[in-house]
Amino acid sequence: RGFDTRIFKQAGYKTFNLGSSAQTPIQTKVLLSRYFQNLKPKMVIYEVYPETFMIDGVESSLDLIANDRNDIHSISMALQLNNIKTYNTLIYGFMRDILHLNQTYSEPLNRGKDHYITGGFVERDMAYYTPGDIEKKDIRINPGQFSTFRQIIAFLKSQNVRIILVNAPVSSAKYRSYSN
């Protein structure tokens, strides 16, 4: 959601952001499993933000279950995360799907400072950086996230998809907050 699809379009590329904020490799694998055959990408630009490799993925699982269809990949994700919040949301999500309660729902294109742009980009109103202290932390990679990331890379390579790994810029204060 952080790559402006309009810029790629101006350069002659057809793109789609297949992600959300705080999305971990576990959710990326679900989306890739669900949509790869329809999208058939020739290239994948994958943002490898360290903190998404550190978290458990529960928050993003709730978002994915609530905002996309639910299927065997949703169940697999819930079992991998093994968290009561994910299980409860999955049950609720399947109930909404079975009762067709999501068919008429339409996500608003504008929500607060966020504005959806065709292709999966979310533009945010201009805000000025205000420096502040950021708590120091070690980067501690969650083994499950890293294992899933490796599976994604292996799958994309097996499909002859060009992969570009990027790390979006962060403020120098944020960068210095990592203690290892």
Label for each model-derived stretch:
Residues R1-A78:
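Membrane-embedded segments
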